[in-house]
Every structure is written in structure tokens, then in C-alpha cells.
Amino acid sequence: FLGEDPWDRLRTIRDHVKNTKLQMLFRGQNILGYRHYADDVVEYFVQKSIANGIDIIRVFDALNDPRNLKTAIDATKKEKGHVQVAFSYTTSPVHNNEYFATLAKQFEEMGADSICIKDMSGLLKPYDAYDLVKELKSSVKVPIELHTHYTAGLASMTTLKAIEAGVDI
């Protein structure tokens, strides 16, 4: 579109931002797009991302399917990057705190350096955030991060309750 080389841009940012960790969002087996890619393509993209300046790769799958995260997690660990595994927060009869805690434990066992609650729709309510963070903190040893949106106007209070519950980032 702009005729730019994204790796050049990343290296330029890294040259000017020396003491700050750079993070990218990575859609698991879909990399940055909306279709699946072969394992070797995922591995090479992770390698190039870290080699060009990315420190933290936040990897997620919209379906919370760990199978779609394994290659990216393994590749990030191989390249000595920090792999933050995110789960997509939603609400339903099966998407409860026990479900998310089990998922977080599985991500930790797969090699996650940190876990992110990815509240991409802004659905997480303040007291639900408190309970979820407490459950996660008792289930995993790695740091927990909250990423939320202001869609429902609750983000500041949700963040406050998550802090009170001990969220790390």
C-alpha cells in the first residue's frame, strides 16, 4: 500500500526505542491475517519478527484453541522471545472462570511467559474481572495482564477491580 518494508520500519523503531519492549499481536496459525498458514511459515515469521526487534509476541486464537497456538509458542521460545498467550474473553454458559483458569494453566504448560485476558469486546464487568483475576492468580504462576476495551463504558472500573485482585499488568 505505502511501498514500505515493514521490517525496515520495525528496525527504525527499535533503533529509536532502545529501552522499551516492543510487542506484537500474533493470530496464532493465522499470523496477522484471517487464514491458516503452514507451520514453517509461522516459524519463519516469528524468527524474522524477533530478529528485527520484537521482544514480546502476544499470541491468541479467536476460538481459544490451543492447537492453533502451539507452533507460534514453540517458535517464540526457540527464538528467545517472550511469549504472552492471550485468551479471548467472552460470556456463555461454558465460558466461566473455571474454563479460563483451565485454559490459562494449559497455556502455562505450553510455555507461556505471561497470560493476557483479551477482552476484545469490552464485555468484562468490574466484579467479574476481580473474580477472574483471583481465579487465574491461584491457577498459574506466570504474570497476568488485562487488555480491555471501552465498548460498554466499563474499562476503567474493570481495570480498577482487576488491580485490586492482583493483576500484574
Task: Kindly label every feature range from the protein language model.
Residues 2-21, 31-146, 152-153, 157-169:
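Alpha/beta enzyme core
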